[in-house]
Amino acid sequence: MDSFTRASLITFLILLTLTSLVFSNGCMMRGGCFKTSEDAHRLIMQVDFYICGNAIFDTFMDVCRPGPRRRKRDLRRKLGIVMDRKESHKFLRRRKRRVYDIVEECCMEGCIVEEVSEYCD
């Protein structure tokens, strides 16, 4: 690989990285965060919120408790504790084995109300 091609490739990778950082920062303020869907029919889905710590339990109880269900809008309003992705990563520790659970769904990747309801009995 000649030096011009190598320099072009490095420049391209740096610009690509910077572009992804610019567009990923503060996505909640620009109308919503998105993540890859587990559903093969939809490529992208909007994230309702990032929640960590005690807020996960409170949200789980609100979504899974028997009786009248809260509407999504009411649940988001009650959750005034929504945080950005960088802040939510502080709550997680590295694990040797990859385990997907409600903490990883909602704290690290962000989740929607329907994903929380998947953890109900």
From Swiss-Prot:
Record carries keyword rRNA-binding: no
Cystine crosslinks: 52-107, 64-120, 106-111
Localization in the cell: Secreted
Maturation propeptide residues: 25-45, 69-97
Highest taxon, organism lineage: Eukaryota
Native species: Exaiptasia diaphana
This protein's record includes keyword Acetylation: no
Assigned keywords, A-Z: Carbohydrate metabolism, Disulfide bond, Glucose metabolism, Hormone, Secreted, Signal
Pfam families xrefs: Insulin
Role played: Insulin decreases blood glucose concentration. May have evolved to activate insulin receptors (INSR) in vertebrates. Molecular docking studies reveals unique interaction with the human insulin receptor. In vivo, insulin-like peptide injection reduces blood glucose levels in two models of zebrafish diabetes (streptozotocin- and glucose-induced). Also shorter swimming distance of zebrafish larvae, an effect which is not observed with human insulin.
Family statement drawn from the similarity comment of this UniProt entry: Belongs to the insulin family.
Name the UniProt record assigns to this protein: Insulin-like peptide 01
Primary residence: secreted
Leader peptide range in chain numbering: 1-24
